[in-house]
Amino acid sequence: MEGLTYKYYKKNNSKNIYLIIHGGGPVGVETDFISAIFDTIAKTHNSALCFNFPYCERMEESSSGPDLLEEISTLKQVINFVHTEGYNRITIIAKSLGGIISSYYFAKYPDKSINLIILGYIPNEIKQNAISENLKLIIQGENDRFAAPSEVQKIAGSKVAIIEIKNADHSYQNHNKEPIYQNEVLNHLVNWI
């Protein structure tokens, strides 16, 4: 975890950890939504960890490039860390770009023991075949600009649960760009856990 900004809640005797992976933009773990996911998971008496990808530390808007090499390497470092901490049940909660990065990671390092939840699925960017054994849940806004929930269900398949957030966009905001549906997402996450 050297060189990474991260938040880590370690619940004593927990073998479950939730890795929260932020979406695009220059702000990662400091965003209100990622912080709220972290706090919500911690309240379930499970361990939680969220971290910034290096491009956030450099205050850059976007990832390291189309192959996401830096992000894959960082995620590998984080997963290695949680294994050394003794966790045997890992679930990744990935927002948007985090879902894309996760799919690239699993294409390079397949691991059926890690579960994946995607918040805001981007069909043309995610390597669906790489995550078919990992993906358990997608929470998609009804008005997501990348894909409607019904479209995502066709791509992800019947083994994946899809939760539609009515009237929400890709960031779970209303038409005025107010994040009023984010709490609904948090409630669904708690119910899923």
PLM feature spans:
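A conserved short beta-strand
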Residues: 111-123
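Hydrolases whose catalytic domains are alpha/beta-hydrolase-1, hotdog thioesterase
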Residues: 101-105, 127
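Short beta-strand/loop motif that positions the catalytic acidic residue
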Residues: 132, 137-140, 144
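Gly/Ala-rich beta-loop-alpha elbow adjacent to hydrolase catalytic centers
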Residues: 93-102
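Catalytic histidine-centered segment of alpha/beta-hydrolase-like enzymes
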Residues: 168-182
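Acidic catalytic loop of the alpha/beta-hydrolase fold
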Residues: 142-147, 170-171
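Serine-hydrolase catalytic machinery in alpha/beta-hydrolase-like enzymes
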Residues: 1-85
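Conserved alpha/beta-hydrolase fold motif
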Residues: 89-92, 116
